């Protein structure tokens, strides 16, 4: 791709090398540690499902039992496999026996690694076959109907009731949406368990549960088959259960997942050591399941200024790319995020927005970039808001962004009505249709505002990444360099649930998933 911005690709290469070094240094910590939610995700992938009489999910029952018996360092796969050899039960049977008190995993004699792996391998293979079938079904739909060229129209439903979400999602898909995201209920990020079953009472969103995933997936397939196009389903694996939600998404054929390496640390005060370990396994799973991940750089601009902090967004995109590569993901699955969030009262911000978006496209040419609409400077004036969204849509099509979250004219007033979404879809379709090839017709003036701005941001981001490489990621976060939010290394939620792995530890799913895509 020829650079319309005259970017210095020596700087790009330096920035990418710094980000890779940051990720590699952090990966040494990741490889030595596991967490309760990583092990609960292993339980889920081994087929452990359901809740006990107190509505506690059985994966939590098993992992809490491992924690209480100081067995978490050997990992759920080893402990469950050992119990399978001893008792002849399958993983679900082991979990139910632990729950009833019939089985104490701490009192079972240790069997050989070969016996444990022999017991667990058929279960692992069965799960992989299920995920492979999901990937195959998605690919078959895309082969039959084709995939959309240009930006995906991406909308959100957030009623709190999965059945009402389905009504709204189907309406949005019929109006032309390509991706439906189901917002999670307020605070689910901070639950250290995943709720169970279909839910009807969320606040500001709907609980992410495996049953809700299944119901929405079936509904979107129904619309897709009517319309002869594949409708993608998106949810959120951030918070204290990142890998568990990734596992549920892989089992129920979700297509897109919000999955940022730093978001939970900065915006939910989750301990950085916990989040960094959790994001790795979640990305290994998403990579194998063919899921596009969305990163959360757009959130930085809600707490920091989009004009002065633009370089931190680019630096974070480089870091998220490096972490995704470390987890074995392909560039085509990296929906690196940014947003149209500059103050419209400032002159020439449209040019700065265009520079930022074009820069991201040139630096990450294979990434399906996720572009977020204006929210911070939406006032409740719906007419101005619709124009702001139109300008956002113009930048989207001019710079070939891929996942375009449609702005709503009623932003800052209320959760969108179905009619609001219809108008947003119409707005985007009009601009994308009439400006389809305009981006190819445009060049940017050498020495002009757009080129100068992009190169300034790149230079600052490269310098920042060089500084982070020296400091290390954890110290950088402590200093508040991202999003103007400081977090202590030993603070936040979930630190007590991070443990150093034992020599016996193994995670069979990382072994078979990393660096591969199901088929």
Predicted regions located by residue number:
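Alpha-helix-loop-beta-strand connector modules within alpha/beta enzyme cores
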Residues: 143-144, 194-232, 276-293, 350-367, ...
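Hydrophobic faces of well-ordered beta-strands that scaffold small-molecule active sites
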Residues: 151-158, 179-183, 229-237, 256-261, ...
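Catalytic cores of alpha/beta
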Residues: 163-170, 240-253, 308-309, 383-397
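Conserved, well-structured core segments that form the ligand-binding/active-site neighborhood
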Residues: 202-330
């Amino acid at each position: 791709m020829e650079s319309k911005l005259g970017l210095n690709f020596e700087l790009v290469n330096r920035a990418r090398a710094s980000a890779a070094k940051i990720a590699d240094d952090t990966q040494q910590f990741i490889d030595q540690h596991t967490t309760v939610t990583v092990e609960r995700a292993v339980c889920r992938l081994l087929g452990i499902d359901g809740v006990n009489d107190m509505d506690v999910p059985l994966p939590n029952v098993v992992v809490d039992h491992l924690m209480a018996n100081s067995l978490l360092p050997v990992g759920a796969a080893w402990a469950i496999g050992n119990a399978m050899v001893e008792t002849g039960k399958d993983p679900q049977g082991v979990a139910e026996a632990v729950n009833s008190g019939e089985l104490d995993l701490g009192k079972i004699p240790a069997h050989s690694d070969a016996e444990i792996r022999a017991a667990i391998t058929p279960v692992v293979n069965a799960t992989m076959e299920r995920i492979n079938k999901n990937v195959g079904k998605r690919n078959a739909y895309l082969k039959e109907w084709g995939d959309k060229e240009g930006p995906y129209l991406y909308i959100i439903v957030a009623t709190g009731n999965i059945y009402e979400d389905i009504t709204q999602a189907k309406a949005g898909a019929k109006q032309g949406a390509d991706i439906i995201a189901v917002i999670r209920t307020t605070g689910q990020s901070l639950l250290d368990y995943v709720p169970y079953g279909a839910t009807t009472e969320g606040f500001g969103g709907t609980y992410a549960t495996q049953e809700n995933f299944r119901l929405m997936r079936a509904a979107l397939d129904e619309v897709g088959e009517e319309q002869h196009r594949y409708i993608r389903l998106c949810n959120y694996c951030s918070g204290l259960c990142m890998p568990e939600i990734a596992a549920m998404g892989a089992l129920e054929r979700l297509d897109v997942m919000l999955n940022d390496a730093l978001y939970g640390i900065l915006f939910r005060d989750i301990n950085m050591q916990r989040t960094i370990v959790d994001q790795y396994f979640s990305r290994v799973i998403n990579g194998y399941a063919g899921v596009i991940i969305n990163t959360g750089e757009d959130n930085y601009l809600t707490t920091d200024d989009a004009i002065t902090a633009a370089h931190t967004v680019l630096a974070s995109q480089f870091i998220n790319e490096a972490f995704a590569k470390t987890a074995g993901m392909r560039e085509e699955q990296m929906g690196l995020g940014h947003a149209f969030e500059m103050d419209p009262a400032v002159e020439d911000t449209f040019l700065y927005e265009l520079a930022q978006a074009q820069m991201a496209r040139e630096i990450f040419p294979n990434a399906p970039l996720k572009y977020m609409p204006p929210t911070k400077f939406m006032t409740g004036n719906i007419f101005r808001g619709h124009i702001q969204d139109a300008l956002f849509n113009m930048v989207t099509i001019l710079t070939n962004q891929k996942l375009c979250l449609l702005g709503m004219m009623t932003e800052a007033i209320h959760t969108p009505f179905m009619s609001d979404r219809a108008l947003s879809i119409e707005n985007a379709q009009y601009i994308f249709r009439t400006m389809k090839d305009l981006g190819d017709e445009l060049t940017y003036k050498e020495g002009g505002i757009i080129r100068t701005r992009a190169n300034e941001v790149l230079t600052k981001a490269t310098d920042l990444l060089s500084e982070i490489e020296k400091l290390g990621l954890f110290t950088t976060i402590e200093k508040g360099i991202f999003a103007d939010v400081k977090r202590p290394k030993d603070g936040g939620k979930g630190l007590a649930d991070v443990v150093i792995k034992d020599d016996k530890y193994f995670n069979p799913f990382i072994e078979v998933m990393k660096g591969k895509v199901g088929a």
